[in-house]
Amino acid sequence: EISLGLVGSEMCIRDRPGDIKYKDVNGDGVVNDGDIVAIGSTSKPNLIYGLGLSATWKGLDVSLHFQGAGKSQFFTYGKCIWAFTEGQWGNILKGTLDNRWVDAETAQKLGIPANENPNASYPRLSYTDNGNGNTTIYEYKNNYRNSTYWLRNGSYVRLKTIDVGYTLPKKIVNKIHFNNVRIFMTGTNLLTWSSFKLWDPEMGASRGEQYPLAKSITLGLSVNSVSYTH
């Protein structure tokens, strides 16, 4: 939840509008490390599956291979989404700025438009510690603690490979003294369905600083010549 007001707690001493507000899990009236509980599942998928389909019609053939993973969650963190952290003081990604709470004071300092959007995907833009005053320990910073706010679903379904081919009719290939001629196209990692959109969910990466699996398309021609005997 993005807070629209101040919260009195040990964990969040300097909360401002747009900061993350945490639940008082144990109900003692104070939000602190005593409210930390286990959440989510493992970043390694507990379910991996696949499905293969193929069909032919006259000279046309199509083969599909789907791959998926489920029962997986991971926390997102790092400089890709946490503005002005890890020594990256000069720049932030445009996508994280455009969909973030930016109060008028910060906007004026940075020379950018204010964006006090209560439905923003990211909390208040800040370039100083907004936790309990400890500027050296990341875990103590209010907006950048592991929580359900940063927990993401790692499940996905991917069209891993697709192969489409066309075999020329025999009456045509025999005239040019071939036994079989097939034209084909093979694609890899062309489509992915996932609720997670920031980077490739198959990487299982929390920071998004790895190369995603490459998409590829291959065009080919398969030819079998006629064998003659004497």
Describe every region a protein language model picked out.
Residues 38-40, 49-52, 171-172, 206-208:
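Generic recognition of flexible, low-complexity loop/linker segments
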Residues 46-62, 168-170, 222-223:
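Surface-exposed extracellular loop regions of Gram-negative outer-membrane beta-barrel proteins
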